[in-house]
Design a protein with these regions (language model features):
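The feature captures the conserved acid-bearing segment of alpha/beta-hydrolase catalytic domains
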Residues: 174-238
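Primarily recognizes the serine-hydrolase "nucleophile elbow" in alpha/beta-hydrolase
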Residues: 138-202
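C-terminal catalytic histidine-bearing segment of alpha/beta-hydrolase fold enzymes
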Residues: 231-280
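N-terminal signal peptide c-region/cleavage motif recognized by signal peptidases
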Residues: 12-14
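N-terminal cap/lid segment of alpha/beta-hydrolase-fold proteins
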Residues: 19-54
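Conserved alpha/beta-hydrolase
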Residues: 88-110
């Protein structure tokens, strides 16, 4: 099986000319207003990273903690892509657009120290969240010819990827859950409690789980993901972890195995093939 997967990897990544991504700011009026003394329209922002080759497929990405991208311009994409940020050319080569997703303007509040003040589980699990994302999907379809949509979350972003997968059903082609959060934040259970007993069997579209086997973050235990995964789990091995064990440079975020993890995700999107382990 490993030699077959290797051949597939060559098909997608071998001898491909360099491709580029063009960042495009997207804003959707979600049809509601916010404000106390004066009302203003609520907008859902995203950044489309559009490949230089034609594509009809996009991966909507929700970042890890704080979970709020705070998008102001099209240049805010890199700090919000976690371990995918240095491998966007691989998506361009595969003909997959990346869409960096933010929380809507009425849920977009972050305190010093990267502490979210909004966009918690109440919003992420709601029909309103799914409706807001539908607005972006509609813009991608009508403006850029995107008809195949996948949703991915990393760490706290998996609150969105799981609930959107449930609430959008077959409106999307699949969902990817990286370093899934399954234990609520100990300082505020409104961040993470909704997925402590989440029913993964309720998801209609295909599902991929990817998790480092030595993830040490207390909110994202590997054993829990193993327990609910079937044949749809990629276990990442090896690499190196530095800094915060729940941060962007540790094994929690595929430290030292970022490229291999990215390639495995792309391979699943293109072929539905799951590599049981990578990084050995």
């Amino acid at each position: 099986m490993k030699w077959l997967l290797g051949i597939c990897a060559l098909v997608w990544f071998g001898n491909l000319a360099a491709q580029t991504m063009t960042p495009i700011l997207i804003e959707a009026d979600v049809g509601r207003e916010s404000g106390i003394f004066s009302k203003s329209p609520v907008v859902q922002r995203a950044i489309l990273l559009k490949p230089s080759i034609p594509t009809n497929t996009a991966l909507l990405f929700y970042r890890g903690w704080s979970g709020i991208a705070n998008i102001k311009t099209e240049n805010d994409w890199k700090r919000n892509l976690n371990y995918l940020q240095n491998n966007i050319e691989l998506f361009a080569q595969a003909g997959i657009a990346l869409v960096v997703m933010d929380c809507p303007s009425d849920e977009n509040r972050v305190a010093p120290g990267n502490k979210p003040l909004a966009c918690n589980d109440d919003y992420r699990s709601s029909a309103r969240h799914a409706d807001d994302v539908r607005k972006i999907i509609s813009l991608l379809r009508d403006g850029y010819g995107i008809h195949n949509v996948y949703v991915m979350g990393h760490s706290y972003g998996t609150i969105s990827s799981k609930w959107l997968a449930k609430n959008l059903g077959n409106e999307i082609q699949g969902s990817i859950h990286s370093a899934s959060m399954t234990v609520a934040n100990k300082y505020s259970r409104s961040y993470g409690s909704s997925v402590e007993s989440f029913d993964m069997t309720s998801l209609k579209a295909p599902v991929l789980n990817i998790h480092h086997g030595d993830d040490q973050c207390e909110n994202t235990p590997y054993a829990t993901v193993v327990a609910y995964s079937k044949n749809n789990l990629i276990t990442v091995k090896g690499g190196e972890g530095t800094g915060d064990i729940c941060g962007g440079t540790h094994l929690h975020s595929m430290g030292g195995r970022e490229e291999a993890s990215t390639k495995a995700i792309i391979q699943w999107i293109k072929t539905r093939q799951v590599q049981a382990t990578i990084g050995e």
